[in-house]
């Protein structure tokens, strides 16, 4: 196996393992809040952690879940250049969705996906974060805000990258970045299938709802 292939495989493996760290579960257990998988929706992400009533814990989960997506992409850059950033970032999202440590039952990839966007295409990431915040603040439904943000990510990659802005994955290969963001968006949408059904039925829970 040559050096390039070795670096690629290490980036994918490292991204997956980093993404699979269940920070929400770890933090709730360490804080005495219990097993987050038995609280609220059972999801290990920040929105469900917020249902414990501990805002600081939810914020920390959000930052760590986003951080591991960004870290996976940026560490891959040091390993083998920007060409490895997007594959490693996607691997991190997959790791969060299907963590080996939890029987491949993980979160929904929103914070981790946004972390990847911020690391590989910060203008797109910032716009998507702002879009998530605006929608969430307006209608108080986290899932709808997330779906809206990721739906626009591929289009934003084409628009912003087409102007030559952002890090190399965006400025130099905006079509590839758009394709990668489309894949992340598809994964996020698939993991939100139940949420989408509840949104259509008008029964989706709102941000801050206690378990």
From Swiss-Prot:
One biological process term in Gene Ontology: phospholipid biosynthetic process
Regions that span the bilayer: 8-28, 84-104, 116-136, 145-165, 170-190
Any one GO MF annotation of this record: acyl-phosphate glycerol-3-phosphate acyltransferase activity
Keyword Nucleus in record: no
InterPro entries referenced in this protein's UniProt entry, alphabetically: G3P_acylTferase_PlsY
Protein location: Cell inner membrane
Enzyme class of the recorded protein, top EC level: transferase
Cellular component GO terms, alphabetical: plasma membrane
Catalytic activity: an acyl phosphate + sn-glycerol 3-phosphate = a 1-acyl-sn-glycero-3-phosphate + phosphate
Topological type in the membrane: Multi-pass membrane protein
Swiss-Prot/TrEMBL keywords: Cell inner membrane, Cell membrane, Lipid biosynthesis, Lipid metabolism, Membrane, Phospholipid biosynthesis, Phospholipid metabolism, Transferase, Transmembrane, Transmembrane helix
Keyword Cell membrane belongs to the record: yes
Pathway the protein contributes to: Lipid metabolism; phospholipid metabolism
EC number per UniProt: 2.3.1.275
PANTHER family linked: GLYCEROL-3-PHOSPHATE ACYLTRANSFERASE-RELATED (PTHR30309:SF0), INNER MEMBRANE PROTEIN YGIH (PTHR30309)
Similarity comment text for this entry: Belongs to the PlsY family.
Assembly, per entry: Probably interacts with PlsX.
Record function comment: Catalyzes the transfer of an acyl group from acyl-phosphate (acyl-PO(4)) to glycerol-3-phosphate (G3P) to form lysophosphatidic acid (LPA). This enzyme utilizes acyl-phosphate as fatty acyl donor, but not acyl-CoA or acyl-ACP.
Protein name according to UniProt: Glycerol-3-phosphate acyltransferase
